[in-house]
Amino acid sequence: LTLGIGLSHEVMMAQLGIGFDKPIRHLREYLSILMPLLEDGKVAFKGETLSCEAEVFRTAGPRPGVVVAALGSQALRVAGTRTDGTTLAWVGPKTIAEHIVPTIAAAAEKAGRVSPRIIATLPICVTNNPAALRNQISKTLSMYGQLPSYKAMFEKEGVSEPGDLALVGSAS
């Protein structure tokens, strides 16, 4: 069992009327509450923006894994030092090898933690018309290319739109 969490994106938080000031601080504080609750069932934490004093029922056994949807260097370092790894969307193999792995692995090693999990998700499609499907994926999911964190990953990978990262081909 693994719990995946993420920071969201400024534009999405604005739509909900929620501020996006200092997202890395928010992530650190959130994990300062979440991780002890999952580990021991109790927490006493007072941060700059988040506070929690609670005790919850926790069943016996190991805590569930926790991964952070992290793309930028700061978030990857937090994930590497505080969680079990990261979960990625719209990140290609070049960027994983040259940016994601070195950043999160170095943070984990510096913190004396085991090598973190890296979970990558990409659409996989079988079709008789790969070009048309890639075009449709890019049109349907164009918003990802407009979000700063994904746009940065596209640039690192050398692609311009989501369809360029999809694994698309024919059955033959």
Residue spans for each PLM region:
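Active-site-adjacent structural elements that line small-molecule/cofactor binding pockets in enzymes
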Residues: 1-172
